[in-house]
Regions:
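Ligand-binding loop in jelly-roll beta-barrel domains
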Residues: 102-106, 114-115, 123-124, 133-136, ...
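His/acidic/aromatic-lined binding-pocket segments of jelly-roll/cupin-type domains
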Residues: 98-100, 107, 120-121, 127-130, ...
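Loop-centered beta-sheet repeat module
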Residues: 179-242
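Functionally critical, mid-to-C-terminal surface segments that flank or help form catalytic/ligand
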Residues: 261-325
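Short, basic/aromatic beta-hairpin or loop at an interaction surface
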Residues: 172-189, 323-331
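Short acidic-glycine-tyrosine-enriched beta hairpin
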Residues: 195-207, 338-360
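Conserved short histidine dyad/triad with adjacent acidic residue
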Residues: 107, 111-115, 133, 304-323, ...
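Transition-metal
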Residues: 1-174, 238-239, 246-281, 308, ...
Length: 376
C-alpha cells in the first residue's frame, strides 16, 4: 500500500536513521564520538569506518510520529513534493546518491571508469572527497616514470600473491610466511614510485568525478593516527561494478585467501595523459559564495552529478535557504541548530523535502553544516 503523508510532514526535516559500518581493522572512534554515541553500549570498544548519511536504502524518521520510512517509500508518496519537479525532470525518481562519512587507514590502489567509456561489466562511479582533517592519499600517476614498469610491478605482485595464497590454503606455507614474502616483494618493486603521494590538508577537496584517475587512501600512524577523515559524495554504484583494484597492498584474509583484484582492467582504465594527472585540476579549496549576518556559505563541489556547500553559522545567527527547486540533504558536522520545531543535532543528517520551500536555520551554538543538492 502506498505511503500516505499529510502536507505538514512533507514540509519538515526528515532525520536519516544512523547506519554505521563497523571496521575493526581500519576504522576508529571519530564517527562514533561525533554522533554522540561514545557512551553507547552498542559501540563500546568498537571501531567504525564509515557511516552512510544517505543512500538508496536509507531509512528516515517521519517527523509526524517518529516512525521509520524508507527513502524509496517517501519519494513514492509524492515525488515532486519530496524531490522537486526540476530534480524529477533531470534525474528521475531513483536518486542514486551516496553520501558517506569515512575514517579510513589505507585501501587498495583503485580506479573508476570514466563516463563515456566501456570495459566489461564496469560502470562509472563519480565521487568527490572533502578532507575534514589532514591525511594521506595517492592520486594520479607520475608521467616521468615508465607505465610499462608500473604495469610489470603490479602484475608481479598480483601473480606472487595468488601463488602464495594457494600455498597457504594448501598448507605448504604459513600465513605469516606469506605476508613476509609479499612485503619483501613489494619493497623491492616499490609501486609507490609510480604514483603521486599527497599529504592532504584540512578542507582540501578531491574531485574524482572524471574517472580514470588512480587513487588510494594511505596509512601513516605517526603523522595521522586517525587516518583519513573524509566526507564523501558519490553516485551510488556497488563496488563490485565500479572499483577496480590494481594493488591490495599485500593483504591476505585470515584463511589465506585474497580480495578480488583486477590488475589488467585497472591498468587499461587509468588515464595516462598529463592533463588528467595534473593535481591542480582535481584538488582545490572551498570558494566563498556569500557571507552576511553571521552566516557564511562556501562552495565545495560543483559537478554534473551533485553539489556540496558548507554553511557556517555563528551562535545566535540565522541562515535562510530555499529547497523549492530540489531537495536538500543537510549533515550537521559541528554544533547544534534549530529548523522550525526540529533540532538539528551534531553528527546527524536530514532530508529537507522540496515542498519545504524557504526555510530558516537558527544556530543555538556555532554550527557547520554540509548541504548536498543536485545541479538543476
Amino acid at each position: 500500500m502506498p505511503l500516505s503523508l499529510d502536507q505538514r510532514s512533507l514540509q519538515a526535516p526528515w532525520r536519516i536513521v544512523d547506519e554505521l559500518i563497523e571496521q575493526p581493522s581500519w576504522g576508529g572512534r571519530y564517527i562514533i564520538d561525533l554522533k554522540g554515541l561514545g557512551s553507547s553500549e552498542q559501540w563500546s570498544g568498537k571501531k567504525v569506518g564509515q557511516s552512510y548519511e544517505l543512500s538508496r536504502k536509507a531509512k528516515l524518521f517521519n517527523p509526524a510520529d517518529d516512525s521509520k520510512v524508507t527513502l524509496a517509500d517517501l519519494i513514492a508518496s509524492d515525488p515532486a513534493a519530496v524531490l522537486g519537479a526540476p530534480v524529477l525532470t533531470k534525474f528521475g525518481a531513483d536518486i542514486s546518491l551516496l553520501i558517506k562519512l569515512t575514517q579510513a587507514k589505507g585501501n587498495s590502489f583503485q580506479v573508476h571508469l570514466p563516463e563515456g567509456k566501456t570495459l566489461g561489466h564496469w560502470e562509472p562511479k563519480p565521487e568527490a572527497w572533502f578532507y575534514l582533517a589532514p591525511g594521506l592519499f595517492t592520486f594520479g600517476i607520475k608521467l616521468d616514470k615508465s607505465f610499462t614498469d608500473f604495469s610489470n610491478a603490479l602484475h608481479k605482485i598480483d601473480d606472487c600473491m595468488r601463488r602464495l595464497s594457494d600455498e597457504v590454503k594448501g598448507g605448504q606455507l604459513s600465513l605469516d610466511e606469506a605476508k613476509q614474502k609479499t612485503q619483501e616483494l613489494i619493497a623491492s618493486v616499490d609501486p609507490y614510485q609510480y604514483v603521486n603521494v599527497v599529504v592532504a590538508e584540512a578542507d582540501q577537496i578531491i574531485d574524482l568525478t572524471a574517472g580514470g584517475i588512480h587513487h588510494s587512501w594511505e596509512e601513516d600512524n605517526e603523522r595521522f593516527p586517525d587516518g583519513n577523515l573524509v566526507y564523501e559524495v558519490q553516485v551510488d554504484v556497488p563496488d563490485e561494478r565500479c572499483s577496480m583494484r590494481g594493488f591490495d597492498k599485500g593483504k591476505f584474509l585470515p584463511d589465506g585467501s585474497l580480495r578480488p583484484t583486477h590488475v589488467a582492467d585497472y591498468l587499461a582504465t587509468i588515464e595516462q595523459d598529463a592533463e588528467h594527472n595534473e593535481l591542480s585540476r582535481h584538488i582545490s579549496k572551498p570558494q566563498l559564495l556569500s557571507e552576511q549576518n553571521g552566516a557564511k556559505v562556501e562552495s565545495l563541489f560543483r559537478t554534473p552529478y551533485f553539489n556540496l556547500d558548507r554553511i557556517s553559522i555563528e551562535a545566535g545567527a540565522e541562515y535562510r535557504d530555499d529547497a523549492s527547486g530540489g531537495f536538500h540533504h543537510l549533515f550537521i558536522h559541528a554544533g547544534n541548530a534549530q529548523l522550525g520545531d526540529t533540532k538539528l543535532a551534531q553528527g546527524q543528517s536530514y532530508l529537507i523535502p522540496a515542498a519545504t520551500g524557504i526555510y530558516n536555520i537558527a544556530a543555538t551554538e556555532k554550527a557547520a553544516i554540509f548541504k548536498t543538492y543536485l545541479p538543476v
